[in-house]
Amino acid sequence: MFSLKRQQGASFEQQARLFLESQGLQFIAANQNFKCGELDLVMLDGETIVFVEVRQRKNDHFGSAVESVDWQKQQKWINAASLWLATQNHSLEDTDCRFDLVAFGATASNVQWLKNFIE
């Protein structure tokens, strides 16, 4: 079950990457893991580094994909982005970046792209 869930997650992350590339973003990295959390995708939109969280929900019984990104998850996302930037000799303070959410429903065609999900 865990392996199937991981495979499905990887599939939706790939769909998100393709979707974002079709919107003009450039791929930088995927699945960047840190103790504090993971960055699903790191993309470039012009001069802006975009940290992308990919979420999928088959139904809304336990909340939507968007609702699943709570305050605690947002903090992990920000911390992981900060650590990733440090590996590039940058910081959140000196880098033009944003946090986008790509949320899927039951299928890859049911997609929402929420730019600046974390302000």
From Swiss-Prot:
It comes from the Bacteria. Transmembrane segments: none annotated. Disulfide bonds: none annotated. Gene3D superfamilies: 3.40.1350.10. One of its GO terms (molecular function) is nucleic acid binding. PANTHER family: UPF0102 PROTEIN YRAN. This is UPF0102 protein MS1289.
